[in-house]
């Protein structure tokens, strides 16, 4: 997971979306937003737009954490709910929401939060 995003992993928060078809094959990867070292705004509408334009069936959201703090914040939980609701209207699944740094990651899916 870390390798494709290595250029920004320690410099600033960046949100990426992995777009998948019905067989979970990658259709594409896109940058959703980029922020500062400690702050980033991710818009669920832009994620929905990318999902519709790619005609995907599932998405994985990946957000690097330059600080190394992988504990999900309340804002992460709220964003996950917004994304799930938005995607449900167009029959697209949120397969995972991943916070990661160079050494480790936190997966909402692995932790039963989806």
Regions found by a protein language model. Name each.
Residues 1-27:
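Long amphipathic N-terminal alpha/beta scaffold segment
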Residues 3, 21-23, 33, 37-114:
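Active-site-proximal loop/helix of nucleotide/amide-processing enzymes and allied scaffolds
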């Amino acid at each position: 997971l870390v390798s494709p995003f290595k250029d920004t992993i320690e410099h600033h928060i960046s949100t990426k979306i992995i777009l998948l078809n019905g067989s979970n094959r990658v259709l594409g990867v896109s940058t959703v937003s980029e922020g500062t070292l400690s702050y980033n705004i991710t818009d669920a509408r832009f994620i929905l737009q990318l999902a519709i334009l790619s005609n995907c069936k599932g998405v994985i959201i990946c957000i690097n954490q330059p600080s190394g703090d992988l504990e999900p914040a309340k804002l992460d939980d709220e964003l996950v709910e917004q994304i799930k609701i938005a995607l449900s209207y167009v029959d697209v699944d949120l397969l995972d929401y991943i916070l990661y740094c160079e050494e480790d990651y936190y997966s909402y899916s692995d932790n039963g939060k989806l």
